[in-house]
């Protein structure tokens, strides 16, 4: 046929049977990838330490999505929260993966069947005897079915009425678990961090979809609107479908990058803004302050900080620190976290408590500067010793650890103090195992970063595709020189259906 690669889809332009076939095959590929990727991730996933080596540190991409929908058990006998189980049931991680692969195989067979048996009576227009699709009616059917699915998810799955519920956690990602969620019908339902909004919005959107679907099934579009929007042209469907997809991609890129109830930090890792705003650091200091107010010692107060909370307050878990094109999981970068060393508190020889300035997100190197409680610089690690005034040696800085593995240990040796000051730039200090995975010490992004980058990139591409195909269908007569009202809409030199010599062509006098 001599078609260039970017025009091969014209073979299904006027062939409803094979148009259906290629869409079923596309579903087979998507479901097959999801199931296969899940099995691969389960083969390499280590569930032994959900606190310091959670799924997002290991670079898991599909396991978090299964988990947020209520899957927590494995046929391997482990639970995502670190426990062991004896009866995981059919809907385990492996069960979901297997279901996708079986579904993919059935779709593959269905696609082949529809490719072979493309000329079905259902696609035949009784008036003309030619294959055609009633696109407004199909739109109504799809809208109705999507509405039923959306309503069912919100009313049954999320609420736990007939389903497991969804992953719900506290604002600091410490107590996450799968639980049923009641719909939030008030103003709080519009808060992106309120899980109840997920249930209520799916119920509301599903109801709207069902009503809109019934409307489009029972009411025909006016002729002027039908012709003006080219509702009889399959490329109109392509253009509007691409619009829906790129809009959804932009939305989920935002909810992933900025965080929401749909993207819990326990499953996808913290957001960069939680580092930028000192979100976890403030909560840690609040808890320590509350402990001191209860007459606990500094050591006791810091020892009660959950290791999980301290680990979030580490720059290596910031998704914006990893380069977009650095392959591998976070564990392949700075290593596998083994334990929290404790919180270092620095003091000068006059007894003032000093605070190390933390590294901003987009810096690779940053000067080591220690300030007092008023923000006045009291010590640093100078670049040029000859001009230094505030060096650790000159100021007599010492460090003492509270909580963690080094609880109660203090150092006054300048080299050791400077070592921990440099590490304190990166947040709480952890022992990291770089040997096991041959980690290179260069930060990597989390699945939160990959998901956002991928969806923004494809959303921009699909936005262009929407404009392209929308313009093609709206101005088809201008581009091709063909009147859109002709009975046989044929581009010059082409058959209505490729290889079909019965296509009517306007007689040129």
Curated annotation (Swiss-Prot):
One of its GO terms (molecular function) is chlorophyll binding. One of its GO terms (cellular component) is photosystem II. It holds the Pfam family PSII. Keywords: Chlorophyll, Chloroplast, Chromophore, Membrane, Photosynthesis, Photosystem II, Plastid, Thylakoid, Transmembrane, Transmembrane helix. GO terms for biological process: photosynthetic electron transport in photosystem II. It is found in: Plastid, Chloroplast thylakoid membrane. Binds multiple chlorophylls. PSII binds additional chlorophylls, carotenoids and specific lipids. The chain crosses the membrane at residues 21-36, 101-115, 140-156, 203-218, 237-252, 457-472. It is a multi-pass membrane protein. PSII is composed of 1 copy each of membrane proteins PsbA, PsbB, PsbC, PsbD, PsbE, PsbF, PsbH, PsbI, PsbJ, PsbK, PsbL, PsbM, PsbT, PsbX, PsbY, PsbZ, Psb30/Ycf12, at least 3 peripheral proteins of the oxygen-evolving complex and a large number of cofactors. It forms dimeric complexes. Belongs to the PsbB/PsbC family. PsbB subfamily. PANTHER family: PHOTOSYSTEM II CP43 REACTION CENTER PROTEIN, PHOTOSYSTEM II CP47 REACTION CENTER PROTEIN. One of the components of the core complex of photosystem II (PSII). It binds chlorophyll and helps catalyze the primary light-induced photochemical processes of PSII. PSII is a light-driven water:plastoquinone oxidoreductase, using light energy to abstract electrons from H(2)O, generating O(2) and a proton gradient subsequently used for ATP formation. This is Photosystem II CP47 reaction center protein.
